[in-house]
């Protein structure tokens, strides 16, 4: 029954997504552009064009057509707009009901009749569905669709699931078993996640902030034709937050389900074969409150949300250990293995029109999350699974826009994603319990192999840009920079793991813990120039981007462990791991085939550098490249399940064989990265991406454009280790 309902919801989601126009501009602001003529077909320069919407705190944005009769109103939020055209000696024309989704440029043209009286002609036409100017391929989910989706799919991966061309691991329909999913679009990996145009990935590049869906107005995914404003070699998922308004509004919602609504296929035949439990949902819940409105009308708005959601599951064939704390695993059939997760978000966004020209947005989400027992189905006993508590965690952002005049726009923003997620012991596990792995079935019990007493993977991001927009050109220069830190402290209980085969001890693994490694991204920076040039029915999109990436490893002092197996160790700081520089051109063209804004031919080509976190610095950290683990054989001659030998003695003694590496605690001489791989121009992994597309609006109203797309990707390989 659950599967049937899920398929139905999935088909509904896919159908709704296909009703949304595709294409985009850079930081997911929308635009309205077009040409103004008189009734004879001659272009009209100097026409005042106004775009008004309740979505704008400043109420209206105004530009003037250039000498080609073209105009382009940029930096618009998603919403419904009325566009007014005014010129002395002509009747005023007003176009109502223009609906903008994020990243979409709506073509709104006008033919002004000559008139001596101040008369306004109001036109309510269909909203353009084909973006004839941008070449970026985009899919959009609106807030209405997000509200309709089940709790299990209210995360960033939702849009990936319903976008054709993606492959990989997708969201589990039974309740967010994995919020951190891998995927690829036409073979391109490296998905970047953004909130309001700034990264929310943590230091290693995975999901750093779990989004409160009640704060989201739209979610967009760009998959090809990405402009010079991004260095993504894969896709980009961007979440557009909601804003308050001049009217107070709010919402209270609550969803809950339990195992009482779930069927089971466990029958007598399966029980006879030894299956006693099945995987099932214990509960899924989602509660939320939103409230927003004016603090001061047309001046200061707010929108806030509190949301708490989570789930619980039972894992088939997995049981808690009845004899926990001993060398033995005895499944407790009365306690099936379970997994619980909960998430809490307290978010608020403030929009401030500080002056006629200066607008600020501030966002804060103080979150508290727990992946309580992140176990697999059969890989370990529940007590040996890892459990993470995300605290402190959250997202903090601020941005500023300043239109100097109708042509010149300044923008800036900063973001901080905080992700601290140390592990904690599962119920019943004592600090003295040693992790044991049964080699006959690769099953671990008693404790986890390793733990993290500290894990901070924070990321900061900043951006600044200057746009100069006429009707014919949309020039933009800007800079983006990100910094990240991965601060991880690792320990192993007792500094040892045991390996058994069929319950008999066979070997010991010794660890040189605890140790703490700090890896940084000092700069993931991009400087770019781009232009959108409209020439009759042809629009050229071209740009150039310079990317610079600099990694760093902090100096560290590791005291001698309590076991005394290795001495205190000191490691010097290492800079420029890596230090990469790249020049990345972008070019695209969009052609309005019939001039009616309903058919567009598009192509794009560009070079994109690979998404990179702190992984390269971590791989070159002298702590990571040291010999931190060794194994030795163990023959338990007296069956007491305790190694009767001196583990400080690196040679054969008592019941223990020699250490597998006599350099325990020292450097490994066999692995290092070549300098020409770590530093220089053009050595970073990169893609050349080529895309062609035909978009045709097949109907009006809710009917969508249809597209056929061919994408080719060429990957530039590089050596990594020598």
Predicted regions and their residues:
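Transmembrane beta-barrel strands of outer-membrane/channel proteins
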Residues: 125, 252-258, 304-308, 362-366, ...
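Solvent-exposed loop/turn elements at secondary-structure boundaries
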Residues: 169, 555-584, 588-722
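Transmembrane beta-barrel wall of Gram-negative outer-membrane proteins
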Residues: 249, 279-370, 388-415, 585
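Periplasm-facing N-terminal accessory domains of Gram-negative outer-membrane beta-barrel systems
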Residues: 2-10, 15-142
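Periplasmic N-terminal accessory/gating domains of Gram-negative outer-membrane beta-barrel systems
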Residues: 66, 90-245, 249, 262, ...
């Amino acid at each position: 029954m659950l599967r049937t309902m899920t398929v139905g919801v999935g088909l509904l989601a896919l159908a709704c997504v296909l009703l949304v126009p595709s294409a985009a501009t850079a930081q997911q602001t929308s635009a309205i552009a077009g040409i103004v003529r008189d009734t004879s077909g001659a272009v009209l320069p100097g026409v005042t064009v106004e775009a008004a919407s309740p979505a704008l705190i400043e109420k209206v944005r105004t530009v003037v057509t250039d000498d080609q009769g073209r105009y382009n109103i940029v930096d618009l939020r998603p919403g419904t707009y009325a566009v007014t055209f005014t010129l002395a000696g002509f009747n005023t024309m007003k176009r109502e009901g223009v609906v903008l989704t994020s990243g979409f440029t709506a073509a709104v043209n006008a033919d002004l009749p000559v008139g001596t009286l101040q008369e306004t002609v109001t036109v309510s036409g269909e909203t353009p569905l084909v973006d004839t100017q941008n070449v970026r391929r985009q899919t959009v989910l609106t807030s209405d669709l997000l509200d309709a989706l089940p709790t299990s799919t209210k995360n960033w991966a939702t849009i990936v699931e319903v976008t054709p061309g993606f492959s990989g691991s997708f969201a589990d329909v039974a309740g967010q078993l994995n919020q951190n999913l891998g995927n690829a679009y036409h073979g391109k990996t490296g998905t970047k996640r953004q909130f309001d145009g700034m990264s929310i990935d943590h230091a290693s590049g995975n999901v750093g902030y779990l989004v409160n869906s009640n704060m989201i107005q739209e979610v967009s995914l760009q998959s090809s034709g990405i402009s010079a404003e991004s260095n993504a070699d894969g896709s980009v998922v961007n979440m557009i937050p909601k804003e308050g308004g001049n009217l107070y509004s709010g919402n209270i919602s609550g969803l809950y389900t339990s195992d009482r609504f779930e069927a089971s296929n466990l029958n007598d035949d399966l029980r006879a074969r030894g299956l006693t439990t099945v995987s099932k949902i214990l509960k899924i819940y989602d509660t939320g409150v939103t409230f927003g409105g004016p603090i001061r009308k047309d001046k200061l708005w707010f929108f806030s949300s509190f949301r708490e959601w989570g789930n619980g599951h039972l894992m088939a064939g997995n049981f808690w250990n009845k004899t926990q704390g001993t060398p033995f695993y005895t499944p407790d059939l009365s306690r099936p293995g379970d997994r619980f997760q909960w998430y809490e978000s307290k978010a608020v966004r403030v929009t401030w029109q500080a002056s006629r020209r200066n607008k600020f947005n501030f966002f804060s989400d103080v979150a508290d999350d727990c992946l309580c027992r992140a176990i697999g189905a059969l890989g370990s006993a529940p007590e040996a699974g890892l459990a993470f508590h995300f605290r402190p965690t959250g997202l903090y952002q601020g941005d500023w826009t300043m239109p100097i005049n109708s042509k010149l726009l300044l923008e800036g923003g900063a973001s901080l994603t905080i992700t601290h997620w140390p592990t904690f012991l599962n119920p019943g596990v004592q600090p003295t319990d040693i992790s044991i792995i049964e080699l006959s079935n690769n099953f671990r019990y008693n404790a986890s192999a390793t733990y993290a007493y500290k894990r901070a993977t924070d990321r900061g991001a900043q951006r600044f840009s200057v746009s100069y927009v006429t009707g014919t050109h949309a020039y933009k220069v800007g800079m983006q920079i990100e910094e990240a830190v991965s601060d991880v402290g690792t320990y192993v209980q007792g500094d040892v793991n045991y390996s058994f085969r069929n319950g008999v001890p066979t070997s010991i693994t010794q660890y040189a813990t605890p140790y703490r490694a700090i890896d940084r991204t000092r700069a993931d920076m991009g400087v770019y120039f781009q232009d959108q040039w409209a020439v009759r029915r042809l629009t050229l999109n071209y740009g150039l981007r310079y990317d610079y990436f600099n990694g760093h490893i902090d100096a560290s002092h590791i005291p001698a462990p309590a076991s005394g197996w290795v001495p205190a160790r000191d490691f010097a700081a290492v800079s420029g791991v890596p230090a990469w520089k790249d020049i990345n051109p972008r070019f695209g063209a969009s052609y309005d085939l019939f001039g009616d804004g309903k058919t567009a031919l598009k192509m794009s080509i560009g070079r994109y550098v690979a998404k990179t976190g702190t992984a390269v610095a971590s791989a070159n950290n002298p702590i990571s490249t040291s010999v931190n683990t060794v194994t030795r054989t163990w023959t338990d001659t007296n069956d007491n399940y305790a190694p009767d030998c001196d583990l400080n003695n690196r040679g054969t003694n008592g019941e223990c064989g020699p250490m597998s590496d006599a350099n325990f605690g020292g450097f490994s001489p066999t692995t290092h990265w070549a300098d020409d791989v770590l530093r220089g121009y053009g050595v970073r992994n990169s893609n050349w991406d080529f895309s062609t597309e035909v978009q045709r609006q097949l109907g009006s109203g809710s009917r969508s454009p249809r597209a056929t797309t061919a994408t080719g990707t060429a990957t530039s390989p590089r050596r990594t280790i020598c």
